[in-house]
C-alpha cells in the first residue's frame, strides 16, 4: 500500500470542490492505497480573496460571502510540512483540472502546487497532472524541474498504476 497525499492548491479563497479529488481518491482506494487530502483553500496567508477583487472591479455582485468564511490563521507551509512529516507520503499529487469557475484558476494550479512543494522537505515523488501537462508536457518539464512526473490526459488510473509500482 502506497501513501498518496493529494493537494488542492486553490488560492481563490472560495470553496469549490474540484472534481478530480473524489475521482482520484476513489480509484486510489480501490487499489488499497492510503490517501489523504491537503486543501489549501482557506489559509489566510495563501488565499488571494478573488471574490473581493472581482466585486471591486464589478465582475461580481456584492455579497456577504466573505463573512461566512472562517480562514485558517496557521502558516500554510508549516501545516503542509507537518502533514507530510506525520503522513509520510510516497507520492504528493496535485492537478489543474476543474478547480474553479474561471479557467485561469485551472491553469495556475500547477504553479501553485509547485510553490508549495518548493518550500517543503520530503522524499515523496512529486507528480502533477491536468490541463497544462496534457497540452504542453515539454514546457512543464522545463518550467517545473523539481516535479518528478507529469501525467498527460486522465490521471486517475495512471496515478493508481504508479502507486502500485512504487509498492513493489
Regions found by a protein language model. Name each.
Residues 20, 24-28, 34-44, 67-168:
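Glycine-rich beta-alpha loop elements in corrinoid/cobalamin-binding modules
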Residues 45-74:
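Charged, often glycine-rich, active-site loop that binds/positions anionic groups
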Residues 12-21:
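Glycine- and acidic-residue-enriched helix-capping/strand-helix junction motifs
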Residues 14-15, 35, 45-48:
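Glycosyltransferase specificity loop/lid
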Amino acid at each position: 500500500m502506497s501513501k498518496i497525499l493529494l493537494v488542492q492548491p486553490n488560492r481563490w479563497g472560495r470553496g469549490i470542490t474540484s472534481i478530480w479529488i473524489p475521482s482520484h481518491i476513489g480509484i486510489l482506494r480501490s487499489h488499497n492505497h492510503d490517501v489523504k487530502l491537503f486543501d489549501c483553500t482557506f489559509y489566510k496567508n495563501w488565499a488571494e480573496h478573488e471574490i473581493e477583487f472581482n466585486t471591486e472591479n464589478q465582475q461580481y455582485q456584492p455579497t456577504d460571502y466573505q463573512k461566512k468564511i472562517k480562514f485558517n490563521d496557521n502558516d500554510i507551509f508549516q501545516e503542509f510540512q507537518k502533514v507530510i512529516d506525520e503522513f509520510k507520503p510516497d507520492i504528493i499529487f496535485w492537478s489543474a483540472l476543474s478547480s474553479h469557475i474561471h479557467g485561469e484558476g485551472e491553469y495556475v494550479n500547477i504553479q501553485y502546487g509547485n510553490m508549495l512543494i518548493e518550500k517543503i522537505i520530503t522524499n515523496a515523488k512529486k507528480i502533477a497532472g491536468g490541463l497544462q501537462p496534457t497540452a504542453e508536457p515539454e514546457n512543464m518539464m522545463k518550467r517545473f524541474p523539481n516535479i518528478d512526473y507529469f501525467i498527460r490526459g486522465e490521471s486517475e488510473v495512471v496515478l493508481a498504476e504508479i502507486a502500485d509500482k512504487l509498492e513493489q
